[in-house]
């Protein structure tokens, strides 16, 4: 009898052992919860002293109901720093799934979890480089999803040495360099996606020759190899003799010397020819930071001393000249190629070229049409001066007429220029400076305070404002093939209240056709790429790109001439919608607004309708704007 009772006691003890172990596993999970911020939903079911495997802990998976084997916490807006030390106390943890959150910073040291089999971190904001030996201590990894983050540097060689790796998704990052070869010991890899990075070189034969491997490399312009049907350039032979190398070096030196002499002579001749022509130049390196100033230099003919009795009359003359059509200024009439500033909009006051010359300027950047500078006038007015090249299709009088027309535009979402300066070789267009800069900067810049203010409500306000501005331009310039022609996030400026103002519009008639096709974003629409045609529907395509850019938070690769970097937002969106995965497109930073998911998805669908490859399948601007206006918070 005693033996029977003892046996029963042992059975009872063993039956409680897993439960006690489970309770002990609750502590590291609760510490993990406390280490991160949760902006969407909660993890209230995670409580110390309770069993994580009781089926009530959200996102916790257990092995045979006895020990924690997986953490699946997605779309909760998690941010902060993951403490891997807490997770080390979960000896049977095999899967970590934290995709579609707001996690940022360097990739945490998951290599401290040697038993890990699945690491799924898609659609976060992890950044920085990954050490080459990062995955050396995680030999059991089978699935690694790091796609759509901001990771950079080279792909870790240790990752491609995992013999059991079955799926690897790293698309939509900023990885560079060559793809490491896949270990010969790996016979199970079935899915590899490295698209939309900045990789280069030949795709390793250990990958390209694999059968039954689904692989994607699109969006890496410098990759080559059989999967892409792009031949690789032959590498130069390294077996040449020393004499051959010396002869080659001498030949190269002679060619360079000749070119330098030739360029020096050309520069002297050009300078001599231009001595008699007055010139407006903003000196400074094209890539100076915003904090560096540049000198504004004018020719001596402009900088004549002005006695005090004439200062007022000259200033008034500038204002009057601004209101005149003929544009006569300090350098003469239309035929001279050099005049004063011509005012087309005096709402912010009037100024002349000398006023602009006295202002210290800052380089803002270079665009497809030229460079931009910020200048602060003596009266405190901050302006942007755009120095535009190749805008020489129209004669002087026709150009003046167009600029006067721009100056009369009035709409809360359209930036009206203040003034312009005419030269045969280049034009200056002056407009009001917007302190919050462009939508491009706020979305993808330093991700500071302005970026943090891009809530769902603010993004909807921006999209609807851009749509209204485009509707206005399509009415004002209805006879133009491209009422805007260059709509992109860098040409959408933001006021203090995030009211968008569209700039750089209706330039097509001012540009030579070959310059327009290289400088204007509408010429990247499918109809021009395929059939060399543009229409107002091309503006609809550009609006769609902006809608999707704002809603996903991704930088479109379509903006880049080389195609290197960014996300192929057209392919990504169309593919996700076809698979009914629209919610996965939403920027995690606004996806926490669960009450508005339907409205966000509707806006994504409108954006997708704008980018249809066939322009006949796109609605016109007015219809698209009407749909956008119907979206509410």
UniProtKB/Swiss-Prot annotation:
Domain spans labelled Protein kinase: 358-633
Positions bearing carbohydrate: 22, 37, 123, 246
EC assignment: 2.7.11.1
UniProt entry tagged with the keyword Signal: yes
Compositional bias ranges of the Basic and acidic residues kind: 294-314
Modified residues (Phosphoserine): 438, 535
Key words of the record: ATP-binding, Disulfide bond, Glycoprotein, Kinase, Leucine-rich repeat, Membrane, Nucleotide-binding, Phosphoprotein, Receptor, Repeat, Signal, Transferase, Transmembrane, Transmembrane helix
Activity regulation remarks: The phosphorylation activity is calcium-independent.
Entry-linked SUPFAM superfamilies: L domain-like, Protein kinase-like (PK-like)
Cystine crosslinks: 53-62, 224-232
Binding site for ATP: 364-372, 386
Bias kind Gly residues: ranges: 328-338
Tissue distribution: Expressed in pollen and/or in flowers, but not in leaves.
GO process annotations (BP): regulation of pollen tube growth
One cellular component term from this protein's GO annotations in UniProt: plasmodesma
Regions annotated as coiled coil: none
Membrane topology value: Single-pass membrane protein
Family, per entry: Belongs to the protein kinase superfamily. Ser/Thr protein kinase family.
PANTHER family per UniProt: LEUCINE-RICH REPEAT RECEPTOR-LIKE PROTEIN KINASE PXC1, POLLEN RECEPTOR-LIKE KINASE 3
Assembly, per entry: Interacts in vitro with ROPGEF1 (via PRONE domain). Interacts with PRK6.
Official protein name in the record: Pollen receptor-like kinase 3
Organism: Arabidopsis thaliana
